[in-house]
């Protein structure tokens, strides 16, 4: 895996970087693990925009990635590393000894021919899945469950990882990428290693068109909108006039907006 640069033959190519895709070993996805993916353009069932700056983009098929890793005590062999347009990391196609196939997130150090397994007796090596209670303290982990059996929800993007900071009888302490220290049930599962494609953060798209291919629409500043569209709109675009706010009037710089009391008890130390 590496980054390639482009000759500045146009304004869009100047400074543009991309992947060389040398780690990809299979270019066509496994048909049995594909599902249709209909674009919603970030609208809900009423047609209202629920997430701004999304829409368009290249047509995709969804890859059915196994985040639960609940096929226990059955070894699987990595037969391919593939590209997934729906996420920033690569995915690994694995084949179990009983013939079943599945996609998993490809961590750093996982190669074709390696063997992975979901078992509390498994070795501590990239790709294996264990319960948090069976993982040694200090291990780097990803694809972490927050509820037993629900599947991994934390640390699934390119280069993401968390650290198992401590263990107790019922809960384990996990240090999240944000610096937050969170307690998670020891029966929740996690995969060993750091998610692959760590160079993703170093990619320079180079031009607006590459963002549009990804389904990302332009972000317009509020002070360049009309007064009807944003609290900072109007005034010939000369200045804000007051503190920066969201389109709904909420302060957006240095103002804490978290109001999730349900999970407060699981947070040992807040993120910085």
From Swiss-Prot:
Residue ranges, compositional bias (Polar residues): 262-272
GO biological-process terms attached to the record: cytoplasmic translation
Keywords: Ribonucleoprotein, Ribosomal protein, RNA-binding, rRNA-binding
Gene Ontology cellular component list: large ribosomal subunit
Residue span of region Disordered: 247-272
InterPro entries: NA-bd_OB-fold (IPR012340), Rib_uL2_dom2 (IPR014722), Ribosomal_uL2 (IPR002171), Ribosomal_uL2_bac/org-type (IPR005880), Ribosomal_uL2_C (IPR022669), Ribosomal_uL2_dom3 (IPR014726), Ribosomal_uL2_RNA-bd_dom (IPR022666), Translation_prot_SH3-like_sf (IPR008991)
Record's keyword annotation contains Ribosomal protein: yes
Disulfide bonds: none
Domain of life: Bacteria
Record GO terms (molecular function): rRNA binding; structural constituent of ribosome; transferase activity
Family: Belongs to the universal ribosomal protein uL2 family.
UniProt subunit comment: Part of the 50S ribosomal subunit. Forms a bridge to the 30S subunit in the 70S ribosome.
Function (record text): One of the primary rRNA binding proteins. Required for association of the 30S and 50S subunits to form the 70S ribosome, for tRNA binding and peptide bond formation. It has been suggested to have peptidyltransferase activity; this is somewhat controversial. Makes several contacts with the 16S rRNA in the 70S ribosome.
HAMAP family in the cross-refs: Ribosomal_uL2_B
Stated name of the protein: Large ribosomal subunit protein uL2
Source organism of this protein record: Bdellovibrio bacteriovorus (strain ATCC 15356 / DSM 50701 / NCIMB 9529 / HD100)
Record lineage: Bacteria, Pseudomonadati, Bdellovibrionota, Bdellovibrionia, Bdellovibrionales
The gene coding this protein: rplB
């Amino acid at each position: 895996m590496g980054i390639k640069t482009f000759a500045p033959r146009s304004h869009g190519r100047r400074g543009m970087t991309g992947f060389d895709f040398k780690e990809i070993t299979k270019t066509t996805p496994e048909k049995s693990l594909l599902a249709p993916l209909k674009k919603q353009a970030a609208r809900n069932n009423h047609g209202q925009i629920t997430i701004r700056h999304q829409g368009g983009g290249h047509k995709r098929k969804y890859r059915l990635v196994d985040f639960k890793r609940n096929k226990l005590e059955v070894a699987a062999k990595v037969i391919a590393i593939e590209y997934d347009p729906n996420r920033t990391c690569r995915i690994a196609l694995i084949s179990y000894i009983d013939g079943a196939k599945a996609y998993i997130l490809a961590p750093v150090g996982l190669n074709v021919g390696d063997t992975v397994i979901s078992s509390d007796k498994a070795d501590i090596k990239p790709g294996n899945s264990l319960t948090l209670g069976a993982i040694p303290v200090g291990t780097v982990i990803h694809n972490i469950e927050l509820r037993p059996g629900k599947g991994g929800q934390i640390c699934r993007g390119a280069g993401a990882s968390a650290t198992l900071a401590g263990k107790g009888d019922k809960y384990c302490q996990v240090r999240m990428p944000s610096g937050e220290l969170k307690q998670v049930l020891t029966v929740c599962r996690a995969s060993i290693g750091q998610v692959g494609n760590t160079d993703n953060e170093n990619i320079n798209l180079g031009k607006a068109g590459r963002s549009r291919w990804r389904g990302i629409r332009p972000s317009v500043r509020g002070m360049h909108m009309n007064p009807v569209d944003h609290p900072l709109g109007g005034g010939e675009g000369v200045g804000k006039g007051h503190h920066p706010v969201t389109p709904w009037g909420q302060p957006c710089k240095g103002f804490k907006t978290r109001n999730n009391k349900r999970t407060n008890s699981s947070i040992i130390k807040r993120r910085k």
